[in-house]
A protein has these predicted regions:
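Polyanion-binding surface elements
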Residues: 1-28, 48-59
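Beta-hairpin "wing" of winged helix-turn-helix
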Residues: 35-37
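Minor-groove-contacting beta-hairpin "wing" of winged helix-turn-helix DNA-binding domains
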Residues: 41-45
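C-terminal secondary-structure termini that scaffold catalytic or DNA-interacting sites
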Residues: 58-66
């Protein structure tokens, strides 16, 4: 199994260039990976966040190629 790391909200914001409210709105809409509860905090699985980013890039590349 691939190694997975957990990301705090600040790191997710940095990697995605999204605001806190945008991240949670996308989670609520089902278009962004759901966080994992770690005590009172929420964290995200790094491979899931990277997969979301990769999917955006793939859509862009498909549109550009068409």
């Amino acid at each position: 199994m691939a190694e997975r790391n957990l990301l705090k909200l600040a790191e997710v914001q940095k990697r995605t260039a999204l605001s806190r409210s945008s991240i949670y709105a996308k989670v609520a809409a089902g278009t962004f990976p759901r966080p994992v509860k770690q005590g009172a905090s929420s964290v995200w699985v790094d491979t899931e966040v990277q997969g979301w980013i990769d999917a955006l890039i793939a859509v862009r590349d498909q549109q550009h190629a068409a």
